[in-house]
């Protein structure tokens, strides 16, 4: 087993042996390894998940060492969201071990592909979201991968990291894994002592025989426990929240010590014996390819080995997204590869229809699409009759731009292909998809594709399951026997990604004489491949309106679109909450009380929780108290989707904003009332995610956009794609959790998207100007 002792002297970050695999032992990422261990990185004869014989596996999730160190295997990818910690807490709540001795470890995607889930993990107890021991139907059956139905109930159930599902979908079987391991340890101790198992108890990693007071540690009985048959299922009981001792407490992230001491291994850090480097340049216009290139110009450059053209990726391997063909230079170092690539003449073959597109004509096409028949998603009451009457009609059109993820770690992957095996080192949110792609590209059976998980320098909706993996696999397949490390430049990372789709929305309301809506019609338009087209609008409105219609409209563009923080919710939340603010102002009513009254009129089963969120946030902020000139407050309410029997996590925020007369915007304070349900796993992690989301969506509101010029994205680095600076972060963020009788839908990326609508309404209150197109830096925000 790789040494993970934090007391080892740390090397410089680039001297840390940067690989994510321990082929002779269980896969461990983020731990110090001396350079002498380089030769042990790859062991083609060994299974990627093989267990060190000195360490005993209790089950697929729990490994206990003789020194009582407990390793918890985590199937989801740590992106900074705290999943290593939260998922480990769920296992350890039931395992009842010493939390200070817990170490996280990535579970093996290879093992997941070979083994079936134990029968005892297939029973999900409870009757639904309101049952503290329930979760309704499991949402994690089957393997997540493209082009294949997969194997239902594979070992780790769900290895994709997305949709705010790591805690939500994992809680029950992870707690069961901890409970099963605990019972095996108890049975082993009872057997060793020759006593009934009913006479032994465990706490903090120590097993006690109650009548005699004898004790054993988990490490002492682990070898016997590993060989103990599965316990009686009746003994594997999951604790209700009232019995939690670890879950619900604030715990620092387990991965932080490794990161701050330079011991974490990211994909960009991987180094292998004999490894060569690949620098890549893709056609800047999506759907384009290489027309010609002149390798002779660089053949004799230092370190250059070859130039390889790669085709437009097979859509079957990358979710039908349109990317580009390109070319890579292979060299002894990345600097040599990149320098030669920049010197080499390349001519691109660009589809003329793509080159003719720009942001202006694409936006115009989306607006025109809303005038055509769309797909009606919701049609309640009789909107046509309501709009044809004597009601006052209020209409507004909003727009949001293309947005990338702008992650800190550029795309990269290291791949070694031999005649009978593929090894991949990558930070990946969908490892099974990447294994499937590797099998298709190389022709090597998927069972012989080994993915060694690395940490990621940000994901924000997607990482790994895109063209960097396919490109690296393609190049390594052309250089069998030689490890190829592909690393994108920052510019390549911008243009070889998928974007959140450009979008527009037209919202129309019919208001009665008192200013209350009697009908609302929503039309949205975005790229036809954009995910989340119905977010926020797909159910009966949370705000009471007797007549409601929602339709979606699409256009087919060549810019690849995909998941990006919150998917469709951030844009749609901006449309909806901004429109509610505008309706309140048109009616001459307080936006907080306007929302509160409309919610109270609905028959939604959880309207009391939404009102509680609004009331709490308003009270926290001092809503209604006077503010100095140039300052304003705005309120908004969020929930995600309608999963879990019509219930989802509820969050209300009040944004206090100041704007100088010169137009400088500052988010002074944010007050958040966030639903706790019947318990959060790690409240500290939730707080950090909420704070991070506030900063992220402030960027969306004020700065971030990608423009299309001659068919290509114009912004390709941080000099043209501005991000907020630390001085722009709100100096005060207050978060209050409130309990409800529900299990939560997950944190995800979209709990604080309403920063956008909050700033929009504050701009209106302070300057008298109503802007409906993001980002706001494009508008005149001065006032006098």
Where do the protein language model's features map onto the residues?
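Short, conserved loop/turn and helix-capping segments at secondary-structure boundaries
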Residues: 465-469, 684, 688-692, 753
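C-terminal glycine/acidic-rich active-site capping loop/insertion
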Residues: 723
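Structural alpha/beta core scaffold segments of enzyme domains
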Residues: 2-674, 705, 710, 717, ...
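Active-site "cap" helix and flanking loop/linker of ATP-utilizing ligase/carboxylase catalytic domains
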Residues: 684-720
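Amphipathic, heptad-repeat alpha-helical segments used for oligomerization and assembly
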Residues: 567, 736-751
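Cytochrome P450 core scaffold surrounding the K-helix E-X-X-R motif
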Residues: 677-681
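Conserved phosphate/anionic-ligand binding catalytic regions in large, soluble enzymes, centered on
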Residues: 694, 750-759
């Amino acid at each position: 087993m790789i040494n993970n002792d934090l007391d080892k002297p740390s090397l410089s970050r680039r001297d840390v042996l940067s690989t994510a695999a321990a082929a002779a032992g269980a896969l461990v990422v983020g731990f110090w390894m001396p350079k002498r261990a380089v030769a042990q990185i790859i062991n083609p004869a060994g299974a990627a998940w093989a267990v060190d014989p000195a360490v005993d596996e209790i089950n697929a999730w729990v490994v206990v060492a003789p020194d009582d160190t407990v390793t918890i295997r985590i199937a989801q990818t740590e992106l900074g969201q705290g999943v290593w910690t939260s998922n480990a807490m769920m296992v350890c709540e039931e395992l009842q071990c010493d939390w200070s001795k817990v170490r996280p470890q990535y579970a093996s995607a290879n093992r997941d592909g070979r083994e079936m889930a134990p029968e005892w993990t297939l029973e999900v107890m409870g009757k639904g979201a309101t049952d503290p021991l329930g979760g309704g139907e499991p949402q994690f059956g089957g393997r997540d991968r493209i082009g294949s139905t997969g194997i239902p109930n594979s070992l780790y159930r769900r290895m994709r990291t997305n949709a705010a599902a790591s805690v939500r979908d994992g809680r029950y079987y992870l707690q069961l894994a901890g409970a099963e391991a605990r019972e095996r340890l108890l049975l082993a101790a009872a057997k060793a002592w020759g006593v009934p198992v009913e006479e032994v108890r465990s706490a903090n990693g120590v097993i006690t025989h109650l009548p005699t007071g004898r004790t054993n540690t988990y490490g002492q009985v682990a070898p016997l426990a590993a060989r103990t048959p599965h316990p009686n299922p009746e003994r594997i009981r999951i604790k209700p929240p009232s019995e939690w001792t670890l879950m619900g407490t604030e715990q620092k992230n387990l991965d932080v010590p490794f990161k701050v001491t330079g011991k974490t291994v990211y994909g960009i850090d991987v180094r292998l014996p004999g490894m060569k480097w690949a620098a890549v340049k893709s056609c800047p216009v999506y759907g384009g390819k290489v027309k010609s290139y002149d390798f002779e110009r660089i053949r004799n450059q230092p370190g250059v080995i070859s130039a390889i053209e790669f085709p437009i990726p097979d859509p079957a391997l990358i979710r039908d997204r349109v990317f580009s063909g390109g070319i890579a230079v292979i060299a002894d170092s990345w600097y040599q590869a990149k320098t030669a690539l920049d010197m080499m003449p390349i001519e691109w073959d660009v589809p003329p229809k793509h080159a003719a597109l720009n942001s202006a004509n694409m936006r115009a096409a989306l607006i025109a699409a809303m005038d055509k028949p769309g797909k009606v998603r919701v049609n309640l009451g009789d909107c046509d009759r309501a709009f044809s009457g004597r009601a006052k009609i209020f209409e507004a059109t909003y727009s949001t731009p293309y947005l990338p993820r702008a992650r800190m770690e550029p795309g990269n992957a290291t791949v070694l292909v031999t005649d009978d095996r593929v090894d991949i080192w990558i930070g990946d949110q969908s490892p099974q998809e990447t294994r499937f792609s590797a099998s298709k590209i190389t022709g090597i059976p998927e069972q012989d594709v080994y993915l060694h998980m690395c940490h990621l320098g940000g994901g924000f909706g997607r990482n790994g399951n895109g063209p960097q993996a396919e490109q690296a696999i393609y190049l390594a397949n052309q250089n069998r026997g030689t490890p190829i490390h592909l690393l994108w430049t920052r510019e390549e990372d911008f243009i070889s990604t998928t974007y959140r789709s450009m979008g527009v929305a037209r919202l129309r309301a019919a208001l009665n004489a008192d200013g209350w809506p009697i009908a609302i019609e929503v039309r949205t338009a975005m790229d036809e491949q954009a995910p989340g087209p119905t977010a926020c609008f797909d159910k009966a409105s949370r705000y009471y309106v007797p007549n409601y219609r929602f339709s979606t409209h699409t256009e087919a563009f060549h810019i690849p679109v995909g998941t990006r923080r919150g998917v469709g919710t951030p844009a749609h939340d901006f449309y909806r909450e901004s429109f509610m603010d505008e309706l309140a102002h048109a009616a001459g009513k307080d936006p907080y009380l306007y929302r509160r009254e409309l919610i109270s009129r609905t028959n939604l089963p959880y309207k009391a929780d939404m009102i509680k969120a609004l009331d709490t946030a308003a009270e926290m902020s001092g809503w209604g108290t006077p503010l100095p000139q140039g300052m304003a407050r705005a309120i908004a309410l969020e929930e995600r989707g309608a999963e879990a029997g019509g219930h989802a996590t509820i969050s209300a925020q009040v944004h206090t904003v100041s704007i100088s007369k010169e137009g400088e915007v500052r988010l002074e304070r944010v007050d958040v009332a966030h639903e706790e349900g019947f318990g959060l796993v790690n409240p500290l992690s939730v707080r950090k995610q909420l704070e991070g989301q506030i900063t992220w969506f402030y960027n969306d509101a004020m700065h971030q956009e990608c423009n299309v010029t001659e068919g290509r994205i114009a912004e390709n680095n941080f000099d043209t794609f501005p991000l907020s600076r630390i001085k722009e972060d709100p100096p005060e963020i207050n978060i209050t959790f409130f309990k409800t009788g529900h299990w939560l839908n997950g944190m995800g990326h979209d709990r604080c998207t309403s920063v956008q609508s909050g700033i929009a309404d504050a701009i209106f209150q302070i300057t008298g100007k109503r802007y409906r197109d993001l980002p706001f830096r494009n508008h005149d925000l001065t006032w006098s």
